[in-house]
C-alpha cells in the first residue's frame, strides 16, 4: 500500500471516529433531556401531570390546580374530623413558612359547609387556601386521608403519600429545586 492510500484510510478512520463520537454525544443528550411537560400524560400518580380539577374555595369562587403553575404545590386531601389530618396541618403550618411552596387543602367530606370550614381553618391557623370537593377526592382516587401530593412548577406529581413529616417535605421540595 502506498503512502497516499494510507493517508486516505487514516483520514477515513478519523472522520468515522469523530462522526461516531458526535452521534453518540447527541444520542446521550437526547436520553438525558427532561421530557416536554406537555408530553407527560395526566394522571393521579407520581410522574403524571395533575389533572386540572376545579375545586370550590370557601368564598364560593373556583380554584384550579393550574392557578398554581410556576410554584411547587402541596395538595392536602383532608377532613375536619380526621385526627391525622389535624397533625398534618401542624406540619403544613411549618411548611407554609417557605416562600417557594404553595399549599392547597381540600376537604373531602361533603357534610361540612363553608361556614364550618372557615371556622375550622381559622381555629387551626391555616394561612393557605382551604377548599371543599368530594369530586376531587374521587378524581384523585383518595382512599385514605391525609393524602398528600407534591407537584413541581410544571404541575407534575413528584410525590404521593399519606401523613408526611416536615423533614420529608423539605427533602422532596429540595430535590425539585
Q: Model regions: which residues?
A:
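Hydrophobic beta-strand anchors of alpha/beta hydrolase catalytic cores
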Residues: 74-75, 103, 148
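Thiol/disulfide oxidoreductase modules built on the thioredoxin-like
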Residues: 122-126, 132-176
Amino acid at each position: 500500500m502506498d503512502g497516499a492510500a494510507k493517508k486516505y484510510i487514516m483520514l477515513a478512520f478519523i472522520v468515522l471516529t469523530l462522526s461516531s463520537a458526535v452521534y453518540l454525544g447527541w444520542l446521550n443528550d437526547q436520553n438525558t433531556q427532561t421530557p416536554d411537560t406537555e408530553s407527560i400524560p395526566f394522571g393521579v400518580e407520581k410522574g403524571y401531570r395533575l389533572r386540572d380539577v376545579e375545586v370550590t374555595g370557601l368564598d364560593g369562587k373556583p380554584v384550579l390546580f393550574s392557578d398554581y403553575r410556576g410554584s411547587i404545590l402541596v395538595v392536602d386531601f383532608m377532613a375536619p374530623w380526621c385526627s391525622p389530618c389535624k397533625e398534618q396541618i401542624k406540619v403544613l403550618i411549618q411548611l407554609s413558612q417557605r416562600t417557594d411552596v404553595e399549599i392547597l387543602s381540600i376537604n373531602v367530606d361533603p357534610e361540612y359547609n363553608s361556614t364550618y370550614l372557615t371556622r375550622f381553618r381559622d381555629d387551626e391557623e391555616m394561612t393557605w387556601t382551604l377548599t371543599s370537593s368530594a369530586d376531587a377526592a374521587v378524581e384523585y382516587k383518595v382512599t385514605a386521608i391525609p393524602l398528600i401530593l407534591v407537584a413541581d412548577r410544571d404541575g407534575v406529581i413528584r410525590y404521593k403519600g399519606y401523613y408526611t413529616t416536615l423533614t420529608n417535605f423539605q427533602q422532596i421540595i429540595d430535590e425539585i429545586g
